[in-house]
Amino acid sequence: MLIIAGLGNPGGKYAGNRHNIGFMAVDAIHRRHGFSPWSKKFRAEIAEGEVGGEKVLLMKPQTFMNLSGESVGEAMRFYKLQPADLVAIYDELDLPQGKARLKTGGGHNGHNGIKSLDAHCGREYRRLRLGIGHPGIKDMVQNHVLGDFAKADKAWLEPLLDTLADNADMLVRNEDSQLMNKIALALGGKAEEEKPAKEMKDAGKKPASQSHIHQARNHNQPKLPATGPMADMLKKMFGKKGD
């Protein structure tokens, strides 16, 4: 069994927050792959199903972000699972909007949900980070993270979540680089192996002190579907606020 845990905060007040993109991701997988209805166990909303022929448990901890590890750790102990049997999906300030990175282990980078998972689940689990961008000023981080996605964010958020859900079998089969390429291409970028060597070399020279500052970039926005489950969900989310 594989646990795919999306991190976020429970309740309608937080549903549209950037910090809740992990919840949005597992919701997308849930809809796309015919999981059981959501139920409550392990202080979480859980759903069982299969992806790519493998048994998967989706989790949305209801403990609030800072205690996510207590919920996920309880489920792992119940099913006698190891860190390798866990994938955590969460928001990442230090990635531009619409970018994704997937790796095993690593640090928490100040993310309280990941701090909690590290404490209760071990550190060698897979981490799927979904970029929400950085506001550029440290004092603005909290409002940015706990603020709702803007309507304009639909241009990258919908294809990101759609592509992740469509290719969740790659996530289950540990085909990490293939999944990252699918997401990059869906967002109008290039597959990882297609990056010029000079670009990779230059990227490695970027000072660590600048990691929180991202310059605005112009990308060709992908054409979005007007209908479908993801479109309906995002219309409801963005429709809560005026233009």
Swiss-Prot record:
The active site is at H19 (proton acceptor). The keyword Hydrolase applies. Residues 190-243 are annotated as: Disordered. GO terms for cellular component: cytoplasm. GO terms for molecular function: peptidyl-tRNA hydrolase activity; tRNA binding. The record marks N9 as: Discriminates between blocked and unblocked aminoacyl-tRNA. Residues 208-221 have a biased composition (Polar residues). It catalyses: an N-acyl-L-alpha-aminoacyl-tRNA + H2O = an N-acyl-L-amino acid + a tRNA + H(+). Keywords: Cytoplasm, Hydrolase, RNA-binding, tRNA-binding. The record marks D91 as: Stabilizes the basic form of H active site to accept a proton. It comes from the Bacteria. PROSITE patterns: PEPT_TRNA_HYDROL_1 (PS01195), PEPT_TRNA_HYDROL_2 (PS01196). TRNA binds at Y14, F64, N66, N112. Monomer. PANTHER family: PEPTIDYL-TRNA HYDROLASE (PTHR17224:SF1). Hydrolyzes ribosome-free peptidyl-tRNAs (with 1 or more amino acids incorporated), which drop off the ribosome during protein synthesis, or as a result of ribosome stalling. NCBIfam families: pth (TIGR00447). This is Peptidyl-tRNA hydrolase. It comes from Rhizobium johnstonii (strain DSM 114642 / LMG 32736 / 3841).
